């Protein structure tokens, strides 16, 4: 849950004067997204999500994200279209923080995706990759492979505290990833955080929408697939569900067939993707004060995924 | 903000099978109410609030509250109508906890009510008192005057910790309240927690709805007015805004004129109402562990209101 910024009715009214949305009819803080404050806003014109950008999202990156959402919506992709102010800007500010209004998207996220959900999610991801083609915005992946060793060097002690001996294992992983990391894959605009809580389904189980694009960047499409495999296809007991993974890849390839080099790269990409989430969770774990309002996610969940990938996945027989 | 219970998509679907509301289209935890978990639920039939009842609300009291909401809605009062299950029950259960679905009510609560808001709120309260007449449900006010001394005896030390010497002042207040408490006032079903965050306004500033009836009980109507005066008519600096108070009473009397004995009783009722909220905040303050997710409200805010009422209000010249 996340509502870090408290907006009064007077602040809301003043903010909405900048938009052509009519008067507010309802306004409720919602428990969605962990990085920003989100509000359900209903006005005379329709329903929207108002986001106040808090920590981690850099203000200078916001035009990249908001322009991407407009680009995707213009191409029919079901992401939330940003609503421009009267002066045509999609980025505004509220309480001195960056803020934006986007369309409300119906749909429900699923907690325990089935193979059928994975197939739909995979197709939605490929659709996103195709819809994003030609988007002129550029943003390097600041959590990409080159960032991992420097990031780990700052949190080595936290890793040892979690599990004695872990830092040597991670060092070894990082060396192998550096050596084996593929650099010749098709790249483009990727979501980079396509987790189940960022994907909505219709009540009939069909893909409905993707949200929370605030890690989007330029990187290999197949890396986005690898992040998604890690996020959707592990069981609670840490085992990898190959049926779900094949369904996800099958759904993806309905829209965008993977090339042979992408398929070959997937196991190492999945290992790297597990490293990326292990490292950022480790960093959050170490830097979260005891008793903080937001409980950090368990880094060891991704350490276990790393261990599975160390063995090497066989995704394509 | 309050979402204590995490509901998965599968749990939601199973729960909704008990209702004739169609498939779920959207479901979001919302930051509303501090005692229960609330979710915005959109289905094929419309928009609703799903409440999972957590601490403080007694399960055996829920039929009283839900039947009251049905009673009020049947009489045209703008409170949220409970939605019955297929078998006709308004009370259901989810994750082993009591749960109910009620209509979604549009409207916005105001943070800093103006005198105009106070007038509207006062009228809405009188409307509630009239609409509740004849409701057959009975519930004693377990936070009424008789409960205050026993409650304070358990939290005397917390009062001294907050402000040395405070416990003797409160003892004196309690003795005076016991002596002067009026017992011959018109009584009926009251809201008992009619605070600004429990009242919605339309965008034109008109009263829209009242929510959160989970302190409702049988007590003097004028006591409900006194609770409301305390909640709406104090400035942030602790001063009592007599203009706002007169507007509130004026709005109330548009619908239900106060009798001479009710008017005469208001100052002592307001002092007692300040005591009631001081005491429950004191109890929450003492029993909340350091680092808890919910920050208790400041008891001293109501201690300052008590001090104002100790001087005696002149509401009717």
Swiss-Prot record, chains A, B:
GO BP: threonine biosynthetic process
Family affiliation: Belongs to the pseudomonas-type ThrB family.
PANTHER family according to UniProt: AMINOGLYCOSIDE PHOSPHOTRANSFERASE DOMAIN-CONTAINING PROTEIN (PTHR21064:SF6), AMINOGLYCOSIDE PHOSPHOTRANSFERASE DOMAIN-CONTAINING PROTEIN-RELATED (PTHR21064)
Gene3D superfamilies (UniProt xref): 3.90.1200.10, Phosphorylase Kinase, domain 1
Name of the featured protein: Homoserine kinase
GO MF annotations in UniProt: ATP binding; homoserine kinase activity
Annotated keywords: Amino-acid biosynthesis, ATP-binding, Kinase, Nucleotide-binding, Threonine biosynthesis, Transferase
């Amino acid at each position: 849950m996340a509502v870090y910024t408290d907006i009064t009715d007077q602040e809301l009214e003043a903010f909405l004067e900048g938009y052509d949305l009519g008067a507010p009819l309802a306004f409720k803080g919602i428990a969605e997204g962990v990085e920003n404050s989100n509000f359900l806003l209903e006005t005379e014109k329709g329903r929207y999500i108002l986001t106040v950008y808090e920590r981690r999202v850099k203000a200078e990156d916001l035009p990249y994200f908001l322009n991407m959402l407009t680009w995707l919506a213009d191409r029919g992709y079901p992401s939330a279209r940003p609503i421009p102010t009267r002066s045509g800007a999609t980025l505004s500010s509220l309480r001195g923080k960056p803020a934006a209004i986007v369309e409300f998207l119906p749909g429900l996220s699923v907690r325990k995706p089935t193979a059928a959900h994975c197939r739909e999610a995979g197709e939605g991801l490929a659709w996103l990759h195709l819809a994003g083609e030609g988007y002129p915005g550029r943003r390097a992946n600041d959590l990409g492979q080159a960032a991992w060793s420097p990031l780990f060097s700052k949190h080595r002690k936290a890793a040892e505290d979690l599990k004695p001996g872990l830092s040597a294992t991670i060092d070894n992983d990082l060396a192998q990833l550096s050596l084996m990391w593929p650099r010749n894959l098709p790249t483009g605009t990727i979501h980079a955080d396509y987790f189940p809580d960022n994907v909505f389904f219709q009540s009939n189980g069909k893909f409905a929408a993707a949200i929370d694009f605030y890690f989007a960047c330029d990187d290999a499409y197949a890396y986005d697939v690898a992040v998604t495999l890690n996020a959707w296809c592990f069981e609670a007991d840490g085992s990898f569900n190959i049926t779900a993974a094949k369904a996800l890849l099958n759904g993806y390839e309905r829209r965008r067939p993977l090339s042979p080099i992408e398929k070959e790269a997937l196991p190492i990409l999945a290992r790297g993707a597990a490293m990326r989430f292990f490292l950022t969770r480790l960093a959050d774990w170490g830097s979260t004060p005891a008793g903080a309002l937001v409980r950090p996610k368990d880094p060891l969940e991704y350490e276990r995924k790393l261990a599975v990938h160390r063995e090497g996945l066989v995704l394509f027989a």
